[in-house]
Each structure stands twice: as structure tokens, then as C-alpha cells.
Amino acid sequence: MKDSFRRSYHARSRRRRVLAPILLSLLPVVACSPPVERPKGAGGAYLDATDMFGRARYDRALEFTESVANASPPNAYTEHARVLRAIILSGEVSAYKQLGEAYSKGAEATKNPSYKAQYERLRHDNFQYGSKLALGLAEVAQQLTQGGTISKELTLEAPYPSIEGPMTVTQLNRVREGGWIESGDQEQAALDAPRMSIDDVLADVVRGDRFKAQARMKAGPLKLDGADFAIFLGNGVLGGASLFDQKHLHDPQKFRILCGIADQAAKAAAALLKENPDPDKEKRLKKLADQIKADLKNV
């Protein structure tokens, strides 16, 4: 038995002696492998923006994309940054408009003077912030459709947000009825509304639902049809313009300017559809164009 043990021991020792030089020879290879460098400049800023987008920190994503989107001359990341900004801003404009309108209804419905005053303040604050976002959306839409043209294909290169938005902001149901919600619920509504709206925007961009958007974005960079995206931009800017109508902030000048930019997006879509006709897109484009005309008549 002792001889058997010795033979086994010596065999293991020989294997260790053989393996040791091999393992040691690999160490320089591992040690000398260059670290993966993080992109700098516009590439680094865009990477930071997509990271923030994936974490549902949309305001930070807007901060990181601002200089890239406004670069002159444009760089390799400029159009990508503009697409990402358009999606975030479109969702946030819708969210803050929804918040403002809910507090407006709450102020009208409540019988409590204190609630009324608080809800009127929240109405004003949300409409004011939403209007700034609407102007930002109009700016990026103008950049993407300059001269009534848009790229035939655009790219959304970002992860799907890891924090999923709700299907509805339940806190606002009580608000609309004139009931009171505490500051914690107000803050949660202010978080949930943009998350919900941006998830809905992503579904709209892929012409499907949230699950389709999530699956397509997980598969890699999402290619977007130019005509489709121009129609999306036009509808988004027109929605932002409504914050300046008589029912909201009543600023006819800004309302007309945004309607003009929505019309520019519509013309960009029309130019592409002239080259490649598509009945479904043409139908949606006509609906957008008719809505722009109708809204301008009501200024």
C-alpha cells in the first residue's frame, strides 16, 4: 500500500512539474494584455449617455448627449445622439404634460382650498418644465430634418431601460378626482410618468409593444426607417406644441414655431415616401399633416 501511495505521489509531483512551466508561460500573456480603453470625446460622452439611458436616468442621458448632438461639424456620434435625445424628450414631454393636466383636473375637482392651491402650483411647474423639454425636442427634430430631409435610415444604439415604467401612473387617478396625495406620492408620480412614457415611445418607434421594443434593442443596434422616424418626430413636436396652446401656457408664437417644425418633419417623411411609396406610412403622414393644419387654425 505504501508503494502504491509513493507511486501516486510521485506521479502527481511530475504532473505539477510539467504544468508549472506551462502556467508560468501564460502569465506574461495575461499580464501584458492591454486594458480595454474607454472611448474619449464624443464617443465617451455617447457611451455615458447610453449607460444612463439603460439605468433609466434620463436627465443625465440628456446631459451627456447635449454637446454631441450639437457638434459642429457633426461627428460619427452626432446623429446617434440626436435620435436618443428625440426619444427621451418625446417621452418626457408627454409625461410632464400628463402630470400637469392631472393636477389641473385635481385643482378643478377638489373642494379643499389648500389642495387647490398646491395642485395649481404643481400644474404650473409641470407645464413649465414640459414646455422647456418641448423646445428641446423641437430643436433636435429640426436638426434631424434640416431642409425638409432626413436620413433614409437612422440608428438607435442603446440598451433597453432596466427600470420598467408602469402601464399607468396610479397616483394620478386620485389627483384627477380631487383627492390629495402626499409629497412622497407626488415624487413617485414624477418618476413613474417619464418611465412609462419613454417605454411607450420605444414601443411606438418599433411599431409594436414594449416587449417587441425590448427584444429588438437587446438584439443589437436598432435600425429605424427614416420616413417612420420623421412621422414620429412630427407627432412628438406637435404634442409639445400643444403645451403652448390656449388650454395650457397660451404662447401663440411658440405654438406656431413648433407647428412649423412638425411640418418640416412631415415634409421630410413625404420626400422619402415619394421615392419609396408605402400606403400605411402615407396614411399616417396625412393624419399628421391634417392635424397640423387643424391646430394652426385654432391658434
Explain the meaning of each model-derived region.
Residues 1-15:
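N-terminal secretory signal peptides that target proteins for export/translocation
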Residues 20-29:
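Bacterial N-terminal signal peptides
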Residues 32-48:
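Bacterial Sec signal peptide processing site at the extreme N-terminus
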Residues 36-39, 68-80, 110-121, 125-197, ...:
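Short solvent-exposed coil/turn linkers within tandem alpha-helical repeat scaffolds
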